[in-house]
């Protein structure tokens, strides 16, 4: 299982500190998904070797302009293992763009309806069940976050849309174990399997994208005959 993190300067902890904590929490890897204006320098291989967890390069695109978002997605698609879009004004754009992997916290500054859920399912865009405000907010904001998660869960279930789960940690102190997240999920109506599946989905996305970029893949739907007579099918 993996967790998507915001490292310094987007957050308050270094990539190395996140990796160390993730290892102690039982994770197999972390996705560094800093916003585009807060990128960080790190040696993924060195950190992985030191702490025994994979460090995945990600990006969370944040803008209110769809044209700019489209350009940024195209720019980062070949440079990052996971491309996320910051939810809100870009919810519709994100679910209609197959190059987007994850629509991050779609309920925080926006909304999701049946049309968007269906589009996400058709285009393979993962909704994020973001438990950050459930864990760290209180009062009305926490209630609103819980209501948003429940509504999103109903739509995801109805349309069988893909999803990921995250505590959205900006500090290593906010990185929760899968067991802790599952327990929190149960208090707001999620079963444990849904939470662990959502944490595992980060790794599934990474594997899929790396496979798509492999030398054997020319374009979706193309079958390539290898020298040994076998075929590689690039269709997803």
Swiss-Prot record:
Enzyme class: hydrolase
Subcellular localization, as worded in the UniProt entry: Cytoplasm
Main location group: cytoplasm
Catalytic reaction list: Endonucleolytic cleavage of RNA, removing 5'-extranucleotides from tRNA precursor
Molecular function GO terms recorded: ribonuclease P activity
Keyword line: Cytoplasm, Endonuclease, Hydrolase, Nuclease, tRNA processing
BP GO terms, sorted: tRNA 5'-leader removal
EC number: 3.1.26.5
Keyword Cytoplasm in annotation: yes
Keyword tRNA processing attached: yes
Gene3D superfamilies documented for this protein: Metal-dependent hydrolases
SUPFAM superfamilies found in the cross-reference section: PHP domain-like (SSF89550)
CC annotations in GO: cytoplasm; ribonuclease P complex
Pfam families the UniProt entry points to: RNase_P_p30 (PF01876)
Subunit relationships: Consists of a catalytic RNA component and at least 4-5 protein subunits.
HAMAP family linked: RNase_P_3
Family statement drawn from the similarity comment of this UniProt entry: Belongs to the eukaryotic/archaeal RNase P protein component 3 family.
Its biological purpose: Part of ribonuclease P, a protein complex that generates mature tRNA molecules by cleaving their 5'-ends.
Protein name: Ribonuclease P protein component 3
Organism this protein belongs to: Natronomonas pharaonis (strain ATCC 35678 / DSM 2160 / CIP 103997 / JCM 8858 / NBRC 14720 / NCIMB 2260 / Gabara)
């Amino acid at each position: 299982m993996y967790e998507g993190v915001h490292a310094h300067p987007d957050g308050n902890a270094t990539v190395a500190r996140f990796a160390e904590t993730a290892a102690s929490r039982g994770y197999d890897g972390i996705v560094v998904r800093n916003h585009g204006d807060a990128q960080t320098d790190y040696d993924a291989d060195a950190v992985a070797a030191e702490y025994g967890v994979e460090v995945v390069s990600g990006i969370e695109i944040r803008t209110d302009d769809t044209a700019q978002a489209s350009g940024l997605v195209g720019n980062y698609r070949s440079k990052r293992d996971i491309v996320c879009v910051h939810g809100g004004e870009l919810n519709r754009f994100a679910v209609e763009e197959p190059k987007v992997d994850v629509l991050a916290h779609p309920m925080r500054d926006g909304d999701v309806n049946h049309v968007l859920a269906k589009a996400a399912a058709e285009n393979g865009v993962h909704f994020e069940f973001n438990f950050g405000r459930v864990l760290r907010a209180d009062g009305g904001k926490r209630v609103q976050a819980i209501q948003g998660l429940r509504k999103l869960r109903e739509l995801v279930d109805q349309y069988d849309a893909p999803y990921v789960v995250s505590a959205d940690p900006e500090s290593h102190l906010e990185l929760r174990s899968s067991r802790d997240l599952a327990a929190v999920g149960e208090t707001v109506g999620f079963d444990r399997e849904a939470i662990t599946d959502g944490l595992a989905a980060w790794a599934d996305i990474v594997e899929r994208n790396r496979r798509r970029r492999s030398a054997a893949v020319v374009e979706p739907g193309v079958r390539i005959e290898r020298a040994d007579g076998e075929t590689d099918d690039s269709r997803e």
